[in-house]
Amino acid sequence: MRRVETDARPFSAATLPVWAGPAERLRFLLGYAVLAPSRHNVQPWAFEIEGDEVRLFGDFRRALHVVDPRDRELIMSCGAALLNLRVAAAHFGYATSVEVVAGSRRDGMLARVRLEERRSTTPQIEELFRAIPHRRTNRLPLDSREPPPGLVAELAREAALEGGMLRPVGESVRRAVAELVAEGDRLQWRNPRFRAELSAWTRSNATRRLDGMPGFARGMSDAASWVQPVLVRLADAGHV
């Protein structure tokens, strides 16, 4: 059994070696899995490969105990990594058998994945696969463009296929939701534990770390990024 390093390293597209055995194929595919998004870019997942099976674990050492006290977003992030793994496997011609582990386990295991028989890819899979290395979390202000016609309905259908629910927010309740979000932000920023946790994952632009949030992700200059962690920790923006 081998625990696999899971930092999201600088990525370049490659071809799955035809000679690779099951463990080598899985290790290769995990290069796509770890490009999934996560809150504060904490990358809260770990993988173990044994034979033709890879096991997905939540890495609770990277849990955000203040902003995510029930580990809800940690589990969602691991689910995103699992989806990337499935998409990459399908792109390279493999079906996957996924067993989601129900309930909480002491070792944090969330799922088991095996590669199954060869299969053909689809245009939808190829579109998702091409997006994996280009996906970025936008931490900058959003623009005012509306999504293309039909996109929200398509996303809702895709969510339902995965057992989830996407509920669009209509214009009539958008302001109420925005006010709730703004009030939640104010309450969080008044909490020194929240600010300390956020500061711990805030990086300068010169960081060599592959996790956390560098200043350039928020459009900051190099100079501003050096003082950002201190300002985050000390500034009580909830009373501004």
What are these regions (language model features)?
Residues 1-240:
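Acidic, surface-exposed loops and disordered segments
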